Amino acid sequence: MRALVIVDVQNDFCEGGSLAVEGGAATAGAISRFLAAEGGSYAHVVASRDYHVDPGAHFSDQPDFSTSWPPHCVAGTAGAEFHPDFDTSRVEMVFSTGAHAPA
């Protein structure tokens, strides 16, 4: 049995987000194309999302990018949503991480 775990394909980690990674949007689309072609070969497909409710000192206006970060993936914001190019229709379950602590 094989499972596929897809990690944090969220707006804040894609271009235009508060903690963007170059190529994030293209990766979201590539994952969707992969799922369309190969998703049926996995017994389970799940995803995680960084989802901060109260991250404490994890967020900073002057982050060091080691122990503190700019605000990102705040629960209930557009940045915390999955990127629109990531088709979640094959995702069985989403696991939220980082609610009250760094993920």
Locations of the language-model features?
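Active-site alpha/beta core segments
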Residues: G29-A103
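Short glycine-enriched, charge-decorated loop/helix-capping segments at active-site entrances
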Residues: G17-G24, P71
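Extreme N-terminal starter segment of soluble prokaryotic enzymes
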Residues: M1-L4
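Short acidic, Gly/Ser-rich segments with clustered Asp/Glu that frequently serve as metal-coordination loops
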Residues: Q10-G16
